[in-house]
Design a protein with these regions (language model features):
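N-terminal beta1-alpha1-beta2 submodule of the flavodoxin-like/Rossmannoid cofactor-binding fold
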Residues: 1-97, 101-117, 168, 174-190
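Short, glycine-/small-residue-rich phosphate/pyrophosphate-handling segment
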Residues: 106-107, 121-166
Length: 190
């Protein structure tokens, strides 16, 4: 099975460069997913969205829909269309985001806002029906993970994907949640 992991966290090295925070909770969850998926024989690719140029939706055109409603692409010349098209090549998706202020990260919101606009009403969607695993990583108390996972439920509804697992992770429960992540990577089941 081909699985795409999209993560939405990084540390800024300088004003032009981002690198994944290799000691952070989100990166640790990505590593755990990659390890388990590969152990199960899956072909895995990871894209850190923060390292890409993804601009916010412009709500352009008539009634704010631009060409995304009819053509299922975005007029902006950034990395979004390439990633969106690339998503067609995969059988399942793992979305891993940090939780900031009881919400998914800003880069996740930006990416998913545009993804919904291009794909939610696409009857020929190549994403619809595919399994997703959503992981919300909170460095604080973890109280924002549920709100973040509810936002993923809404995304799942509009994209027509199949929610395979929704996993709240905190600094204090990460070791326990490793087993949950491991089990969630068994995408061939159910």
């Amino acid at each position: 099975m081909k699985v795409l992991i999209l993560s939405f966290s990084s540390n800024q090295v300088n004003e032009d460069s981002f690198i994944p925070n290799k000691i952070g909770l989100t990166f640790s969850c990505v590593e755990e997913c990659e390890k388990e998926l590969k152990k199960l024989g899956n072909d895995v690719e990871h894209i850190c969205i923060n390292r890409k140029n993804i601009q916010k939706c412009l709500a352009c055109g008539k009634r704010g829909w631009g060409i995304c409603l009819d053509k299922h692409i975005c007029i902006q010349k950034d990395d979004f269309n390439e990633i969106y098209k690339h998503m067609e090549d995969f059988d399942a998706y793992i979305f891993v985001t940090p939780v900031y202020f009881h919400e998914m990260s800003e880069s996740a919101k930006t990416f998913f806002d545009r993804l919904k606009r291009c794909d939610a009403f696409n009857e020929e969607s190549k994403i619809k029906g595919k399994k997703i695993v959503c992981i919300a990583c909170a460095g604080g108390s973890g109280s924002g993970t549920e709100e973040t996972l509810k936002a993923f439920d809404t995304l799942n509804y509009f994209l027509g994907t199949k929610m395979h697992a929704r996993i709240p992770v905190t600094k204090t429960n990460f070791e326990k949640q490793r087993k949950v992540i491991e089990n969630a990577m068994k995408l061939e089941e159910n």
